[in-house]
A protein has these predicted regions:
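The feature encodes a structural signal of leucine-rich repeats
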Residues: 94, 120-121, 147-148, 170-174, ...
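Residues that cap or delimit alpha-helices
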Residues: 6, 18, 123-124, 138
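Conserved long hydrophobic alpha-helices within structured protein cores
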Residues: 3-17, 128-133, 203-214
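Hydrophobic regular-secondary-structure patch
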Residues: 2-118, 156, 169-170
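Internal alpha-helical scaffold/solenoid segments in large eukaryotic proteins
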Residues: 181, 185-204, 208, 215-217
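Acidic, glycine-rich loop-and-beta core segments that form the ion-binding/anion-interacting portion
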Residues: 219-221, 225-227
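Concave beta-strand-loop units of leucine-rich repeat
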Residues: 55-57, 77-84, 107-113, 134-141, ...
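Leucine-rich repeat
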Residues: 39-52, 68-76, 98-105, 124-132, ...
Length: 227
């Protein structure tokens, strides 16, 4: 019965079903639809922008094999728990980061210091469609190179969340973050010190910023939230 509906109606139904704004585990809900029948598969894969299709990658899957199966859709790279494998987990993240022109979302939390430093080393290139970056190291990593990290420019980034990531050159990078709405930096230390003057200067470019959190290791914090 449902296949009697016009394609435009089916597309509206699919759009409601695959809406990725609800939960990250719904990012690949569209995969269920494409396996129902050829008609549904064609409708879904012919409408990647309308349905906001994305491929979800995480450290626990063979990334290269997965990316070879599907069309070149935007990549959602995420891991929200400590289920990291010592070797192939980082290798899978690195394989996903090779697709820097396709990555739209990165969320890697509770990552060991050694693994995080390997990941940061693989991010010294441009990520032109990246809108969200969440990086949480279990302990402090080496300082990030401000000139090469993310290619030195983040024009599409909307959310930036860093924990235990020293980044003294962050203000230089933020100058390009004209779409940033949410900036949260936790466990800031002396090695990642950013002068108040430098931060204030870069804030003039962040005209869309709504949420700002700066939390220091000394338990002193400065937080501003606007709605």
């Amino acid at each position: 019965m449902i296949n009697m509906l016009p394609e435009e109606v089916l597309l509206e139904v699919f759009d409601f079903y695959v809406d990725p704004t609800r939960r990250y585990d719904r990012v690949e809900a569209w995969c269920t639809l494409v396996h129902v029948c050829r008609k549904w598969r064609n409708i879904v894969l012919d409408s990647p922008l309308c349905l906001k299709l994305q491929i979800c990658c995480h450290p626990g899957i063979p990334v290269r094999e997965k990316l070879d199966i599907w069309p070149a859709l935007p990549v959602f790279l995420a891991q929200y728990d400590k289920d990291w494998q010592p070797t192939w987990g980082v290798a899978n993240v690195a394989a996903a980061l090779e697709q820097n022109n396709r990555i739209c979302h990165i969320a890697l939390l509770d990552v060991s210091t050694s693994n995080m430093e390997e990941i940061l080393a693989a991010m010294h290139k441009s990520f032109p469609i990246l809108t969200e970056l969440w990086l949480h190291s279990e302990d402090e990593t080496a300082s990030v190179d401000p000139d090469s990290f993310l290619g030195g420019s983040i024009p599409c980034l909307q959310i930036l969340y860093l924990t235990h990531i020293p980044f003294p050159g962050l203000p230089n990078l933020l100058i390009s973050a004209t779409h940033l709405t949410n900036l949260q930096l936790f466990n800031l230390s002396n090695s990642g010190y950013i002068s108040p003057k430098a931060m204030v200067s870069c804030f003039f470019a962040l005209t869309r910023l709504e949420i700002l959190t700066l939390a220091f290791k000394s338990n002193e914090s400065f937080s501003i939230t606007e709605h």
